[in-house]
Structure formats: C-alpha cells, structure tokens
Amino acid sequence: MTTPQLPLQDQLRGFSRALFSTWIYHRRFNILFDAGEGVATALFNRVFGIRRIFLSHGHADHIAGLVNLINIRNLGAGDQTASLKIYFPKNNRLIDLLREYLSRTQNGLSFDLEWIGVDENEQVWLEDQKSRIFIRTFRTKHSNKQLSLGYNVIEIRRRLKDKYHGLGQKQLNEIIWAYGKDEIAEDIEKIIFSYGGDSRPIDPDSVRQSMFLCHECTYLSIEDDERNFQQHSHLEEVLEIAAQADVETLLLFHSSLRYSLEVLKEQICLGMQKIKAKFRVLVLYGDHIIDPLAEDFPKNSRKKTREKEFEQVIVEGDQ
C-alpha cells in the first residue's frame, strides 16, 4: 500500500472561479487537470514537471491556459525535452480548433507533444509511478453539445481475502508456505483522487469511496441559477452526492463570484449539519484551498487582501 507523504490537499495547487479559469495540479502524479487561463503564470517553472494533462471539456475557462503553457515548455529555462501528453474528450470541436492553432504557431517543438482523445470508461496507466496506478475516465453532464469527462486516479492495492480474516500470523504463514501469497491476498481498486470538471451532480457510483473528490459547486442554491442553464451544480446536491458516494474528503471548486468566503463558510456549515455529513469539506477559493470549518478560518481575509493590494497600488503610484 502506498501512503502519501503529505495530506492530499497539500499535494495540490490550483485556481478556480466560475467563468474565469479552472485548473488543478496534482504534484504527486505530475498531472494537470484542466488548464484554465493563468496556469503557467501561477506554476512558473513547475510547468516543466507536468507529464500529463487531462481536460474535462473544451470551454475556454478550462483550456485557454494551454497556449502559454506549451509556449513556455518550448522556450523557458527548464527541461525542454520532457514529453507531454494531453488527454481530452474525443471529437471535441473546440479542442480541435485549439490544436489547429497551436500546430500553426508552435511548430518545431523541442519536446514530444501527444494529443490523445478518450471516451468514457477508458484507462490510462501511469507507467512512471512506482505503484500500480492508472486513470479511469467517467462521463459527466455539462453540455449537450460536447462530451465531458471526469477522471479517477486509481491505485491497485493488495488486501487479505475475507475468508482469512481472524487468522493469526502463524496460521497465515502456514497457508503462504503451502500455497503461496496469492492464496490469502487479492487485488482491489482504490480511488485515491477524483476530478469532475464542470458538471451537473456526478453519479455517486462513478466516484464511490473516493479518498478525495473534486466536485464543482457553482451555486449555493438552485435559485441562483437564474438563466436555468442546468449545466452546473449547487451546494445541497453536491453534499448529497458526496454522502451517497461515501467519500473521505470533498473539495468544492468553481464557485460563482457572487459569494464571499464568509457566505460560503456559513452555507457549507448549514449544509453539512443538515445531512449530518461524516466527510471533510474543503474549498478551492481562487488559488487558496481552505477548510471552512476550521476554527482559525480567516474572517474577512479576502477583503483585507484587497485593501492591502489597493494600498500598494496607491503607494507605487505616488512614487
């Protein structure tokens, strides 16, 4: 069994605000999930460590950052020879247009760039990982005009077969000596990370018992979807999905700009109390992963940050 050296949330870098940009970088696996605007600017030379990119769909706020990322990988001061694979929902017209643009403006790349179209329920093995780890795609519901996908990071683990539970180590050793290790142990698939992209509520069976589910939460209530596009999720249904799927940690992202951090905290607390949630909830608010239930939750932190930025602009302007 592979135990992460850091808590899962500490292995992530990301940014997400509805309409503007969404991306999440998983440092343990060198994987980028979606590539919204600003990803290369935020990661700087860390972009050279990315080995695979998994795109959930082709909307601009999830793919616009690819242009600069590929340019920096080609010209920046890093390993310009490391290959990059980009997985995307197959037959996506918007992504095909971006690929055409990049082929015209970024010809003669210094590294191998491979675009791989995938469908639902496909597997991608991560050969560069020491453990037996692979990605499995699952279908999401976002746009009627294009296929959208979510991604599970799955680790193959070994466990004791049920019929041998309760036996002592001496008895187990005797069975191993007589029949081999495979007699007492079996492989199981464990979802250690799930990313859903933009989506209506994900099917709980697709992410069942995930250790860490990233699920969009654009709205706090269904009434806030004034245009009734029905392409996104609201808080109550996301919490219910996480409970039904029996996940360990839920990371909410893609929140609307209308909500302050304090409002998100209040509504998340109420929502979790309502369903008596047993899982942990985190929020990717801009570029910060925050625990809204923590006692040291930074009240008015966003307001104070903006005030400091404004004061800095005034000082620099006076100079």
Whereabouts are the PLM-identified features?
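Active-site-proximal loop/helix segment associated with metal-binding centers of metalloenzymes
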Residues: 127-208, 212-214
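Short, surface-exposed amphipathic charged segments that create phosphate/polyanion-binding patches used
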Residues: 124-137, 152, 291-306
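Conserved beta-strand hairpin/beta-sheet module of binuclear metal-dependent hydrolase folds
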Residues: 1-46, 52, 149-153, 159-160, ...
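Metal-dependent catalytic neighborhoods of phosphoester/phosphodiester hydrolases
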Residues: 65-73, 98-103, 260-269
